Amino acid sequence: SPLLPAGFYYKTFMWPANFWGKYEYFIRKSAGLGKSPTKPDPDLYEHRYIHCDVLVIGAGISGIMAAKTAAKNGLKTLLVDEKPNLGGSTIYQDSDYFKINNQNSSSWLEKEINEIKKLKNLEIKTRTSVAAFHGYNFLLARENLTDHLPIEQRGNRIRHKLLKIRAKKVITATGSIERPLIFDNNDRPGILLSSAKI
């Protein structure tokens, strides 16, 4: 709105300083900031330190193969993905045209997942988002443990776990989102993104 631009309350109500207490109540209501909770957070949280040789971020085809190769070479490996299931875009690209090593993509994926789950030095974390990548390969990740469950099933279980990861090597295999090229008549019938063709 032209009368109330974003952040107006930081500039407009700075003077006189002793009036701030009176302004604040109305400003918070108009800005939609709501009330701060007065009770303690009922949820449980935890943190864990993880040291590994190789951290693989993303569990699509590339991430699975990178983690499998590292673990089979005797390296302590951690594979993380923000989705609940391993496989990345392969999960929804299942078709007769999308083959990996002359196999249907879903059967290939199932075989690979079963194989990597048997590797002793590979730890897999799904529903885990890497949020920060600091120097010397120190990363922070948040593992969602119960957010996907119905409220009545959560009980007194831990909601989130903060993972503090120190890795010797980090492989980023987060995939991509295909961006369309913009050109004249790109919206005509028969013009598709390559992912739509598969």
Regions found by a protein language model. Name each.
Residues P2-I57, E112-I198:
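FAD-binding core/adjacent interface of flavoenzyme oxidoreductases
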Residues A67-K68, G87, S195-I198:
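Histidine-anchored nucleotide/phosphate-binding helix
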